[in-house]
Regions:
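Conserved "HGTGT" condensation-loop signature of ketosynthase/thiolase-family condensing enzymes
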Residues: 1-229
């Protein structure tokens, strides 16, 4: 059996670990990812060289593993499987800006290296010394069935894998991003929530009402409206 041992949700201004809010919304208003890095990590300078997608995956994984049982997380027994819809679209856009003008042509190697969505899985593996399977999948939309099938197939094909970091990670820009990551474990009892389509979809949709209200507030402020129904 596979179970969800821990889960993390990060969107602009909101961070939830296993359903508990980690920071007050007011503290996260400006730069959510940099704020979390400085508050909780602040010891990995390479963070500032990463693109937005890698920063999001890095931060989400750090928080996900912070209080996890690490007794079975070592070397080659932890896989990393991430999914999204936009690939590395944010960094692709920035790289395109460096080559769009023939008269101002300056392709940047530091930007180009992040024009693959699977780079984030590499950053996570390097940080935590994981040598298990790493993979990044671009889907047409959130698809819990496909995600579950791939995770189960990964565990079935390699019996040495005990845990897996998996989930949805999307980074469009500094104002639009989302991470819904899960620490999945191979278990022999029902101590944790079983991995099902309903489980991961419920977590992905967790507290969406508050997220929507926050977005409405931002729209009101941008448009200088007094009310918005």
């Amino acid at each position: 059996m596979l179970a969800v041992e821990q889960w993390i949700k990060i969107v602009p201004g909101l961070v939830y670990l296993n359903g508990e809010s980690l920071f007050s919304n007011a503290k996260l208003e400006d730069d959510t990812l940099t704020f979390i890095y400085r508050q909780c990590i602040n010891s990995y300078p390479k963070f500032f060289k990463m693109d937005g997608l890698s920063r999001l995956g890095f931060i989400a994984t750090e928080l996900l593993l912070q209080n996890a049982d690490k007794s079975h997380i070592a070397d080659n027994n932890c896989a990393t499987l991430l999914f999204n819809m936009g690939g590395s679209i944010n960094n692709d856009y920035h790289f395109q800006q460096t080559i769009a003008d023939a008269n101002n042509f300056f392709p940047s190697p530091s930007i180009f290296v992040y024009t693959l969505p699977n780079i984030v899985t590499g950053e996570i593996a390097i940080r935590h010394h994981f040598y298990g399977e790493t993979a990044s999948y671009v889907l047409g939309k959130w698809d819990s069935k496909t995600i579950i099938q791939i995770v189960e197939s990964t565990f079935d094909s390699d019996r040495s894998i005990e845990k897996c970091i998996c989930g949805w990670i999307e980074y469009i820009n500094e104002q639009v991003f989302e991470a819904d990551l899960f620490l999945i474990s191979r278990i022999s009892n029902c101590e944790h929530t079983l991995l099902t389509e309903k489980t991961i979809t419920t977590i992905k949709d967790f507290n969406m009402e508050q997220t929507i209200l926050k977005l409405k507030k931002e729209i009101i402020e941008v448009l200088n409206l007094e009310d918005m129904q």
